[in-house]
Amino acid sequence: MPPRQTSKDDQPELPLSVASADAASGVAAPAAPAAGGGAHPPAPPDSPAATEGAPGPGPEAPLARSYREWFLEYASYVILDRAVPHIDDGLKPVQRRILHTFWEQDDGRFHKVANIVGACMRFHPHGDASIGAALVGMGQRGFLVEPQGNFGNVLTGDEAAAPRYIEARLTAFAREVVFNPKTTTWQLSYDGRAKEPVTLPAKFPLVLLDGAEGIAVGLSTRILPHNFNDLCRAAINHLQGKRFRIFPDFPTAGIADFSEYNDGERGGKVKVRAKIEVRSKYQLAITELPFGRTTEALIESILAANAKGKIKVKHVDDNTSEAVEILVHLPQGADTDQVI
């Protein structure tokens, strides 16, 4: 549901000026008696007599000062060093630190994820849970990190096993295109005890390959993933000075409408639907998912629509493993086209 748009009529009326309690009640405040018992008319507001002895602006409130001095620093940190990928290598800081940790310990063999998380804590000033979650996400895509063990399932939404039970290592692709110590700019880690890369000299547009999503302070990003071969062809055309167009490609597949894509710029839209096949007179099969949806969430929406009477469904089977297969069984007399 889109956010509710507010109008001027929805906003409470605020006073343009603040009057004293006496003025608000219609009672005039008594004038201070002058020396000698007489009364003098009030001095003009801008006269020395009116401003003499008036209180100054006073010290700034601690909360206001803290907000003014620290909030911009905090917002800049979240934008630049946490939630948004860097344009040079397409990586968020936690992803860059994970890859650097893998590079330091790389011997061609698998490493326990818990060990990588612990070693990465030397560079990452936040909790170990964020490192583990980012590493699992990179392993699920499989371009930079090769997983071994239960890394969960992006199709069903099943979670990965604990870091002590799963292993990972750098892929050959990552070793080839991501690292080059001779051309890397280094900086001290957050505690000054180690050196980490400012950015990695990636030879491939990683931010378009895996996509990215993050919410910072006053800024958010959502970059959709793209097909590896499409990116290679686009890079070659770009180097040769040829024009090209490229569209997102989703790991969950689906049927996409790019008519309002706007080349990925602000305001563009992509509509993705599940792919549904008619297996028999009273059976439908869902074989592809919209991006960002899981089989569990999709089945829940089907059952909710059935409960509300929008569609008629007998029962639903989820046979998804490496590929999506949701079987929707319809009751006698149901129309498959109407259900779709």
Set out the residue ranges of the language-model regions.
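Catalytic phosphate-handling regions of large nucleic-acid enzymes and associated NTPases
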Residues: 2-267, 326-329
